[in-house]
Amino acid sequence: MEKVPMTARGEQLLRKELERLLKRRPLITEAIAEARELGDLKENAEYHAAREEQGICEAQIRDIEYKLSVAQVIDVSKMENNGKVIFGATVTLIDCDTEEEKTYQIVGDDEADIKSGRISVNSPIARGLIGKMEGDEVAISTPGGMKDFEIDSVEYR
């Protein structure tokens, strides 16, 4: 089974969500039992809604348990920062044309959220940065075409 990289933050968020779902599980079972007492199951909307909710909850639990089982948790905050862009690093780039500054953290696919500045390790930007060093200039394929950036800083937080 191939391991999938995940940040310590990503693991923590998944474990928190799993805990929430596991606490929800008995409440759903209770709702099914209460709905079952209402009578005819064929026309019992409460029963069918609770069973559907149970199915969704169980699927989410299985999904999270699987993700955690294949996760290779990488905590860069415990690594010595040598200025190299690696998985989990937070990288500040300067657009060579506009001098605009952008900061991204390179994370696993499931953790990516561009609005929060977290990009997937498999994204074109991250692939163009991995292995490069602070101070390097890089050409990265973006939706608007090739762009040149300078790696201003690399942090392991």
Swiss-Prot record:
Domain of life: Bacteria
InterPro entries: GreA/GreB_C_sf, TF_GreA/GreB_CS, Tscrpt_elong_fac_GreA, Tscrpt_elong_fac_GreA/B, Tscrpt_elong_fac_GreA/B_C, Tscrpt_elong_fac_GreA/B_fam, Tscrpt_elong_fac_GreA/B_N, Tscrpt_elong_fac_GreA/B_N_sf
Pfam families cross-referenced by the UniProt entry: GreA_GreB, GreA_GreB_N
Keywords from the UniProt entry: Coiled coil, DNA-binding, Transcription, Transcription regulation
MF annotations from Gene Ontology: DNA binding; RNA polymerase binding
Listed GO biological process terms: DNA-templated transcription elongation; regulation of DNA-templated transcription elongation
Annotated coiled-coil segments of the chain: 14-37
HAMAP family: GreA_GreB
Function summary: Necessary for efficient RNA polymerase transcription elongation past template-encoded arresting sites. The arresting sites in DNA have the property of trapping a certain fraction of elongating RNA polymerases that pass through, resulting in locked ternary complexes. Cleavage of the nascent transcript by cleavage factors such as GreA or GreB allows the resumption of elongation from the new 3'terminus. GreA releases sequences of 2 to 3 nucleotides.
Family affiliation: Belongs to the GreA/GreB family.
Protein name: Transcription elongation factor GreA
Organism: Vibrio vulnificus (strain CMCP6)
Taxonomic placement: Bacteria, Pseudomonadati, Pseudomonadota, Gammaproteobacteria, Vibrionales
